């Protein structure tokens, strides 16, 4: 047997994954934990310039199915490095690079938005290398970063019911063995355009 590839894992999980919650959507609407009044008009929408100083550096995107993962190491000033790998018995796909985010903006006390400014790959997309055993490694685009312009950073305490549908799917992957909490208990980064989600803690 061989491990599922990234594409196979996404297809499989799309069929079996459903939102895990111990409350109905209507219950959650009535029990939102965020008090919007706690965020002053002077802070909401303010250009923050940097992310929180205590933001964890390392984030990972993984579904728990298949031999693939994508990661981001990010600094509060928006500079980052990223990588991706996917493998099976006969071949592997890898990617890596570095870049910067700009227009970091504080939305509310649990949420920042930012835009991808630059990203440079470490190697040429499509390049293939074969080892002595015939295993082929291909340098690909970086899943999780490629195709994205706008990214959202969620802080612990962010109400999960307010997050977009794409992020809800990754919450289901992340909290695969426990109910999705009403308030996020870790940090997360969400690619709004391609709907990919990263977390700073392992699958639960």
Language-model features: locations:
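N-terminal glycine/threonine-rich, aromatic-flanked beta-hairpin/loop signature
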Residues: 64-128
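Tryptophan-anchored aromatic micro-motifs
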Residues: 38-71, 185-203
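Intrinsically disordered, low-complexity segments enriched in small/polar residues
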Residues: 12, 40-43, 76, 95-97, ...
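N-terminal Sec-dependent export signals
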Residues: 1-53, 200-203
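Beta-strand-rich cores of mature extracytoplasmic or soluble domains
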Residues: 127-204
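Generic hydrophobic, helix-prone segments enriched in Leu/Val/Ile
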Residues: 1, 60, 101, 151-155
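Subset-of-secretome marker
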Residues: 7, 15-20, 67, 83-92, ...
